[in-house]
């Protein structure tokens, strides 16, 4: 009974597979044949210039500069054929100066420095032609000002003309800035100060002139500072440097405090032995192996002298115990 069921199942499966195979081999009447290409499309493609098509069967009948993008799409072959003579006339026409167009058909009638960006866009050829005399007049102006994307002019440059410290909104404001006597006075002053974008002057440089530690708003704020003293960002002076002048251990607020500290340093230099000080004024009166770290810090000179005397006594006792083993075990120092 089981064998009959297995045979019946195998036959049923074979029948179903043969039915599906025959159904796939029959032609599908609902499938539409691909329409043949129209003669006009073939004729346009065979002629020149060739036109690229997109996924909607639109044709590009006007390319942008360098063929990087399409400025105009044509819906059919008739419109593309009509656009070809128009494109040929535009190429043959000599325009001076030549303006680049964007994807909306606008023309650039005002370039920024180095032609890196456009500062003015014209909607049509008439507006572009009207902008040509204006651009010629601007080119003949002296001095020459660089414009940004908002049409402002730079009437005050920083050191080396690397950045602009003052922007003028129009030609009148720029002309007034040129006639300012302050600009010529600044050029003749010494020492020369670098200015930032707010017109402030640097009257205090950090180590190696890598950064400014004090900015002056006007000539009255500029105070002559000795070259060997480097003011901090709060107007304080460093009157005690750390090793290698890598950091400041003590800041002085005025000249009197600095003179007092110098007198204290001269007095400490005459003392023997010389102790190293930290940023809190403490002295190291006990060094570790190789003087790599300090084992004990003393608050005053008296404490340092007492510790030194005790250290010398302990060293003598250690030498005596080592020289005479009969005196017992060596005490720990």
Swiss-Prot record:
It comes from the Eukaryota. It is found in: Secreted. GO terms for biological process: defense response to bacterium; defense response to fungus; killing of cells of another organism. GO terms for cellular component: extracellular region. The modification Pyrrolidone carboxylic acid is found at residues 55, 103, 149, 197, 233, 279. Residues 29-43 have a biased composition (Basic and acidic residues). Residues 1-23 form the signal peptide. Residues 24-54, 75-102, 123-148, 169-196, 217-232, 253-278, 299-333 form a propeptide. Residues 23-52 are annotated as: Disordered. The N-terminal of all peptides are blocked. The keyword Nucleotide-binding does not apply. Plays a role in the defense of the germinating seed against microorganisms, by inhibiting the growth of a range of filamentous fungi and bacteria, especially Gram-positive bacteria. Not cytotoxic for cultured human cells and are the smallest known plant-derived antimicrobial peptides. Peptide IB-AMP4 has a higher antifungal activity than IB-AMP1. Contains repeated alternating basic mature peptide and acidic propeptide domains. This is Antimicrobial peptides. The gene is AMP.
């Amino acid at each position: 009974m089981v064998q009959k069921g297995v045979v019946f199942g195998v036959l049923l499966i074979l029948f179903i597979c043969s039915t599906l195979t025959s159904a796939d081999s029959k032609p599908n009447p609902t499938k539409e044949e691909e329409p043949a290409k129209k003669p006009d499309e073939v004729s346009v493609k065979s002629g020149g210039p060739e036109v690229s098509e997109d996924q909607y069967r639109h044709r590009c009948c006007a390319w942008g500069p360098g063929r990087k993008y399409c400025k105009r799409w044509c819906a059919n072959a008739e419109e593309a054929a009509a656009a070809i003579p128009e494109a040929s006339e535009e190429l043959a026409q000599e325009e001076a100066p030549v303006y680049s167009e964007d994807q909306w058909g606008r023309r650039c009638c005002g370039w920024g420095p180095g032609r890196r960006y456009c500062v003015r866009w014209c909607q049509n050829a008439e507006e572009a032609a009207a902008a040509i005399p204006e651009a010629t007049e601007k080119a003949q102006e002296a001095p020459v000002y660089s414009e940004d994307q908002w049409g402002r002019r730079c009437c005050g440059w920083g050191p080396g003309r690397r950045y602009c410290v003052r922007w003028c909104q129009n030609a009148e404001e720029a002309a007034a800035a040129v006639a300012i006597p302050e600009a010529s006075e600044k050029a003749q002053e010494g020492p020369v100060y670098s200015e930032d974008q707010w017109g402030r002057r640097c009257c205090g440089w950090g180590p190696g002139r890598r950064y400014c530690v004090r900015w002056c708003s006007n000539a009255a704020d500029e105070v002559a500072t000795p070259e060997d003293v480097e003011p901090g960002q709060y107007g304080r002076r460093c009157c005690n440097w750390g090793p290698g002048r890598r950091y400041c251990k003590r800041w002085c607020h005025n000249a009197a405090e600095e003179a007092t500290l110098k007198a204290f340093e001269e007095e400490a230099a005459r003392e023997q032995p010389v102790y190293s000080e930290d940023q809190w004024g403490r002295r190291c009166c006990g060094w570790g192996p190789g003087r790599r770290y300090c084992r004990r810090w003393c608050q005053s000179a008296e404490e340092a002298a007492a510790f030194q005397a005790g250290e010398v006594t302990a060293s003598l006792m250690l030498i005596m115990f080592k020289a005479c083993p009969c005196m017992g075990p060596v005490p720990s120092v």
